[in-house]
Each structure stands twice: as C-alpha cells, then as structure tokens.
Amino acid sequence: MKGMVISMTQKQKEIIADNLRAYENNFGYIKIVKEDYGKGFYVFTSEERAEQGSWTQYCYNIDYLNGWLYGCVQAANGIMKKIDREE
C-alpha cells in the first residue's frame, strides 16, 4: 500500500479495498485517518498535507469514503464528462 489507513476495522477495509487500490494506482499517496469520535474519516492526499494536518476531504462514514474514492478514479480517467453547454 502506497498510503496508509489508520484505525479502520477489517470490514471497513474490505468495503473500500477495490476503490482504494484503484485510487492508489491513479494518484499514489493517500492517508486515511479515523476521526477520534464518530464514524468519519479524514483523507490526506500528500505527505506534506498529512504532516501539516491539512486534510483534503472529510468523509462522514465508510460508504461516503468508498464513493469519494470511486469518484476520484472516475474523474481521473475521464469517465465523467462535463456538460457541453451551447450558447
């Protein structure tokens, strides 16, 4: 794993495994930290941001995190296209 996942249950790791692997293959570094109180996760997308404590994304639960990882990969690969508005 290029990044790291901190304080996550085995079931949670299994939920995000495919999208996490795809994210790492497209972007490289990721660090996911479970919040102290609650069900959320902080996502850091570079070592510098992690060292500074400057998270990139807050995901309020494991399903949101899984969807966020999926969306990043879809956007990186041009799967989602912007609306072409004609004027």
Predicted regions located by residue number:
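Serine/threonine-rich, low-complexity intrinsically disordered segments
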Residues: 8-11, 47, 58, 85
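Acidic, low-complexity, intrinsically disordered interaction modules
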Residues: 23-79
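Negatively charged, low-complexity tracts enriched in Asp/Glu with abundant Ser/Thr
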Residues: 2-28, 79-83
